[in-house]
Curated annotation (Swiss-Prot):
The keyword Cell inner membrane does not apply. Ubiquitinated by the SCF(dre-1) complex, leading to its degradation by the proteasome. Disruption phenotype: Gonadal migration defects with premature dorsal turning of distal tip cells in the hermaphrodite gonad. Defective dauer formation, shortened lifespan and retarded terminal differentiation of seam cells with incomplete adult alae synthesis. Suppresses the precocious seam cell terminal differentiation and gonadal migration defects seen in dre-1 mutants. Weak dumpy phenotype and partially penetrant embryonic lethality. Reduced expression of the transcription factor bed-3 which is involved in vulval development and failed division of vulval precursor cell descendents. Gene3D superfamilies: Classic Zinc Finger, SET domain. InterPro entries: PRDM1_PR-SET, SET_dom, SET_dom_sf, Zinc_finger, Znf_C2H2_sf, Znf_C2H2_type. This is B lymphocyte-induced maturation protein 1 homolog. GO terms for biological process: cell fate commitment; negative regulation of distal tip cell migration; negative regulation of transcription by RNA polymerase II; positive regulation of apoptotic process involved in development; positive regulation of nematode male tail tip morphogenesis; positive regulation of transcription by RNA polymerase II; regulation of nematode larval development, heterochronic; regulation of transcription by RNA polymerase II. It comes from Caenorhabditis elegans. Pfam families: PRDM2_PR (PF21549), zf-C2H2 (PF00096). Residues 15-61, 779-794 have a biased composition (Low complexity). One of its GO terms (cellular component) is nucleus. It is found in: Nucleus; Cytoplasm. Keywords: Cytoplasm, Developmental protein, Metal-binding, Nucleus, Repeat, Transcription, Transcription regulation, Ubl conjugation, Zinc, Zinc-finger.
Amino acid sequence: MGQGSGDDGVPPAPFSSAAAAAHSPPHSPLSVGVSSASSATSSSSTPPSSTSPAGVSASGARNVETDWKQSGDENLAELCIFHVPDKSVSLPNPKRAECTLPMNLILKSSSKNRKKSSIWSSDHIPRGVRFGPLVGEIRLVDVDTALVCPAEASMAGGGPAQEDVPFDEAPEEWKIYSPSGGRLNKTICVKDDARSNWMKYVAAAEEEDFQNLVAAQIGNDIYFYTVKKIEANTELSFWFSRDYARKLNYSTRPYVRVRRPATQLIPSAPPASASTAIASLAETIVAIDYSVKKLIESPIDTLSTDASSASDEEMIDVEEQESCTRPVAEVTRPNVIQNPVVRPVATKVNNFPGIPVRLGNFYASPLVDFKEFMRKSLQLKLVDTSMFVSPVAQTTAAITATGGRSGQPIDVQPVLAATAGAHFGNYAAIYGSQDFQHELSKPLYTSASPAFGGGGGMGGGFGMGGSAHTSSFHQLPFVNHSSSSHNDSSFNGVPNYVQQQENGKTRYACKDCNKTFGQLSNLKVHVRTHTGERPFKCEICTKEFTQLAHLQKHHLVHTGERPHRCDICDKRFSSTSNLKTHLRLHNGQKPYTCDVCDAKFTQYVHLRLHKRLHANERPYSCGTCGKKYISPSGLRTHWKTTTCKEEDMKDSMRDDLMDIKGEIDEGSMSGSGYGNLGIFENTLNSELKRPLMPIETIYSKYNLPNASLLGQGPSGMQEQQAPPPTSQQQQHMMYGNTMGHMGQGSHLQGPPPPPQHFQMDHSGMQNGGGIPHQHQLIQGGPSSGSGQQQHPQHNGIHRLPDLKNPLLPSLGLPHYP
């Protein structure tokens, strides 16, 4: 073996002339002669073991090829001298796989099976050429099959626990593993010709001499590498690389693919009755952890064989095994286990009608996988019977005596794990529901379908004589899932996320938007934003929430509890997020800046609404007249002042909220600095129910002097009573009202006090500055000499009041200096 063989280093250089001497056995139909010119060597490109002054022997060329076949995937990628891409094909094309064949390759009948096609070379192909990647239909795997045994663990304690290859010529599904081999990321299905490429036709090598390609996983793709020189008119055949074969638990050499070790046949025995056969097997069947459980379908009539005639080294083909009587597989001890733990195994036995069966000690103490039982009983979508019976219970109930109580097997006393009597925690406190506490008093199983037999409940099946047993196991908490809650698709066996590995840490990616999370629980909460699921419902106002914490926070609205207080103005809030947002009004913090006009805001939702002014974005439209508005309040005001029919805006408001949340999740905002998004959500949800607040109501609510603010116009004369605002003016007024509502939280107790150095400048207002111009835009223009109001005309993009005016905090509106 050369210097680069095995695991100790880098294989020889790809242009080694020794590799040009491809070796084929004499009986091979693909034998290629080795000329003297091709056997010339170069000492700089071949290992010492494969070079000689006169030339290269056949054994030296074989060593070089073996070095390449046993190289790691990373070494193969580094030694690639040329990459052959697929031929570009226009889509759609039902024969895409055949049309993607690159140059020097053709598709014709296979040498092993004339009915199937294979890939052949039409010209010389050197060693070190890479083909690929493999193209096919990407299929994600579920959670149960994603985690596999790593390659290192499968080889612990001895030789590798190799599996039989489940295909004859080429696989129809290729598996993509994580770098460690402990997790299956996805599979690539190549059944459909319209969605795959030519690599699906490459046949697997049956013997090592015919192998000229290795299939390696590089990243998340499959590539083929030539491991030796391929002459013209040679059929391409592959086997898996060293690293990829270990991930698949396959042999690294192809010649053991179609053979299995000999199995021991049961010697002939006189026929026995069904009850005797089952009873004898029940006393002897034991299993070891991680071993494959036996499945006995019927008493076996074996053939008389001479055990001594078969040697230990004999290999029995699959066809020979199928022609003989079906043998019982021998229980093998895995290499990982050194001190096995012997325990009884729940064996599936057919119930023979009319024959009373007594199992004796076979089911004396079956060990119930309590953790798995709890997971399925709480997560699976239950059927109309609202019942989940464990597989052990179903098997036990199927084998019963003819005389005895209904549904109760004879001599069956299941023994639970040591954690069966442990307390399961306060589920009522977690879910916060009285209905859940009511469910705690219900037994998990009824007498009509007991899990382990014995009367009503589960006490009778535990050797308690049917008496009431106060263990917490037989009164498991049972959650009655409604149709609108807990619709996690992972309960149906189809996961809604993809597990990934980033920098040695496990990340969970959402299938819908590809966002990644470090915690699986956070991802499950995020998925509810796509499904619209709100499993937590308030019992007072029937409002629904995506998280339990949001429901608990919402309960403070009904109780009126406000535990968080502002140290500056003594205003109280129901949550810390509302308090942090409020403190920005005192310290002047405005972390959100407009990219267009450099306006700054205390909350991100304010900036989001402000940006709609520049972009003329109007997501809320009237279905009757087609007019569009910036905020839901503007559309609601339009419906009040016109004859247009009012519509439901919940969907559009929810989409608007999801857009803002999505921008925050994408990283545009960091930490808790994006402001009180919960207040914005409550505002959107309650916008349709909240009545319109005129500007006069704001003055009376906060005891503001009406004459000092609106009584004096630019001319110094007393203004007449303004007429009711127009629909466009109400839109601006509602926008300011909405901004004030979000800025102060869902419970307005009054605006924060203005700074101590601030004093109201009445002269400025008399000279036409200050707030009168604000309310001229909202309430109406200044009075003319004739005493009639002149309302300004608004064309194009309607501008809002000057949000930088220092009087706005006194009106309950946000202030932006």
